């Protein structure tokens, strides 16, 4: 079965992103296909390259990145929500005249079209 996940909570401070990550790992372990994860609203903070959790905490941001690298899961970030919250890639940083970017490698700034496509092409869409 093909799945897509929507994450609306930040990497730290709520359980939404952590639960979504654990669900993603369970899907893959059970042989399902996870096509994409779409980060929306506060969920865009999962793509912030500048997070630095305590040494005894799981690094959820890098966990998502590993999911992308190891399993080819698309990590789509809502561009409008990201820009409002200061998450930018190199292209947007240049366009906006910012000194640097902070989008974690493996994540892609995307429009809501990416979510619509996932909804149409996957068997299930699960929101956290």
From Swiss-Prot:
Enzyme class: transferase
EC number of the protein: 2.8.1.-
GO cellular component, one term: sulfurtransferase complex
Record keywords, A-Z: Cytoplasm, Transferase, tRNA processing
Coiled coil, from the record: none
Subcellular location per the Swiss-Prot or TrEMBL entry: Cytoplasm
Any single biological process term in GO: tRNA wobble position uridine thiolation
One example GO MF annotation: sulfur carrier activity
Domain of life: Bacteria
Keyword Transferase: yes
Cross-referenced SUPFAM superfamilies: DsrEFH-like (SSF75169)
Gene3D superfamilies named in the record: DsrEFH-like (3.40.1260.10)
Residues annotated as the enzyme's active site: 78
InterPro entries cross-referenced by the UniProt entry: DsrEFH-like, Sulphur_relay_DsrE/F-like, Sulphur_relay_TusD/DsrE
Transferase keyword on record: yes
Pfam families per record: DsrE (PF02635)
Subunit structure: Heterohexamer, formed by a dimer of trimers. The hexameric TusBCD complex contains 2 copies each of TusB, TusC and TusD. The TusBCD complex interacts with TusE.
Family: Belongs to the DsrE/TusD family.
Function: Part of a sulfur-relay system required for 2-thiolation of 5-methylaminomethyl-2-thiouridine (mnm(5)s(2)U) at tRNA wobble positions. Accepts sulfur from TusA and transfers it in turn to TusE.
Protein name as annotated: Sulfurtransferase TusD
Organism: Shigella flexneri
Gene, per the UniProt record: tusD
